[in-house]
Amino acid sequence: MAQTGQLQIAHDQDGSRERLALSGELDVVTAPALDAAVERLLAGRVESLILDLRSVSFIDSSGLRSVLTAWDSCREAGCELLLIPGDGACLRLFGITGVLDDLPLWEPKSGDGFAQLDLA
């Protein structure tokens, strides 16, 4: 697990899906860590990437830029991106900025390997 400033990024895998689970603040200071983590995964030819934002307590425009950049990078790499926004800061910002309906949102079910966030 990587920790930068007030952001923790955990990486795990379930079958063909890779997950980056974020916890803390996604802002101008910490967004580059997300950019780097996505870039590292995509260099390994990932088929499906889940960006789990349920435990993000704060996100600013830099964090939004990183999420949108991850989406673009995944499309360019032929990788499916699934976002789990949770019901907090990320969902609010996505709605306010008008990107909510465009983003590839995903809600894990109880049988999915990523149903629960575990950053312990």
Language-model-detected regions and their locations in the chain:
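STAS-like cytosolic regulatory interaction modules
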Residues: 1-57, 68-120
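Conserved G/P- and acidic residue-centered "switch" motifs that form tight phosphate/ATP-binding loops
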Residues: 60
